[in-house]
Amino acid sequence: MLNKNTIFFGLLLFIPISLLGHWLHWDEVSIFLTASLAIIPLAAFMGEATEEIAIVVGPTLGGLLNATFGNATELILAFIALKSGLISVVKATITGSIISNLLLVMGFAMLLGGLRYKEQVFQSEVARVNASSMNLAVIAILLPTAVEHTSNGIGEETLQTLSVAVAIVLIIVYGLTLLFSMKTHSYLCEVGEIDQQSSSAMESGDKIPEKKPEDVNLWFWLGILLVVTITVAIESELLVNSLESATESLGLTALFTGVILLPVIGNAAEHFTAVTVAMKNKMDLSLSVAVGSTLQIALFVAPVLVIAGWIMGQPMDLDFNPFELVAVAVSVLIANSISSDGKSNWLEGSLLLATYIVIGLAFFFHPVVPEIG
């Protein structure tokens, strides 16, 4: 019988195929497609590994682990692009990652989880704290852009200095959010047992047995997670190296590619993990994956890239394309609005996905930006 695992194991064949295509110098579109297909099962196995580890370390650290390993590939690829001077593509990928996590990943999680359970609940207190943190992230990238567009003759060096200062503030805030969620207010996030009980009570038909921490081989799954993460990074690099020529052949702009296409592929790990746990009625863990990844991109990855660009002599700053900022602000607004009550259903997931589609269409028809393409 054909099931999900059979399909994923079959897709693993695209790992050697994509590597072979790279060594044999296949056309860029073929390499792009095979690398994309190779990432799908890897993301699924990464999600399974992180979920197993989360059983041992708890939903808060598990969510952080999901977000960290999901964004590790993006961070590595961003460093490569930054070193190559592709500043605008790096910025587009940052904003695109925020948009896709809040709308696409969280939307699918709420939709598919809501189709299985009439209503799902999560900690509204944590949702409000995350909403405030995301608002800060919007402010942090909005103000440097506003300074650039409302000032006459501000120098690139001054703008980068401002961006580095803001980046330091964001990293400090990110550390404070970790302290809040894992130390001083960890009780707000440790809700795995509540979710499991509600899952057993609400689920009809076949029931998924809940594993206990002592049933999980932690070191085995850590090894799996390490191997899969390294392979994801290799495949993602193949994908990005072929991306420019492939998207040009497909008639896509670099702006659409950076904001929509790259984050969708790069966030495949978060997507699979968030949806999988949402379908098991673990919405707190699901949202900690999606929102936690968003906060890490905004409060950690972006600031680190700004500081790295400053060290490497690359003009990486927080002056973003105004249209990208509008899309980020809209995404944060609707995500905060939907998650504020601590409840979700399939319709709210549909609204998030509809917003993502509208934003995607806007970027698809957006005219070429000279410095991006």
From Swiss-Prot:
pH dependence: Optimum pH is 8.8.
Keywords in alphabetical order: Antiport, Calcium, Calcium transport, Cell inner membrane, Cell membrane, Ion transport, Membrane, Transmembrane, Transmembrane helix, Transport
GO cellular-component term (any): plasma membrane
Effect of E324 to D/H/Q: Lack of activity
Main localisation: membrane
Alphabetical list of Pfam families matching this protein: Na_Ca_ex
GO MF annotations in UniProt: calcium:proton antiporter activity
GO annotation terms (biological process): calcium ion transmembrane transport; intracellular calcium ion homeostasis
Record's subcellular location: Cell inner membrane
Domain of life of the source: Bacteria
Transmembrane segments: 6-26, 29-49, 61-81, 94-114, 134-154, 162-182, 220-240, 249-269, 291-311, 318-338, 349-369
Keyword Zinc-finger annotated: no
Key word tRNA processing present: no
Membrane topology (UniProt): Multi-pass membrane protein
General function of this protein: Ca(+)/H(+) antiporter that extrudes calcium in exchange for external protons. Plays an important role in salt tolerance. Does not transport sodium or lithium.
Similarity comment: Belongs to the Ca(2+):cation antiporter (CaCA) (TC 2.A.19) family. Cation/proton exchanger (CAX) subfamily.
PANTHER family in alphabetical order: VACUOLAR CALCIUM ION TRANSPORTER
Protein name: Ca(2+)/H(+) antiporter
Taxonomic source organism: Aphanothece halophytica
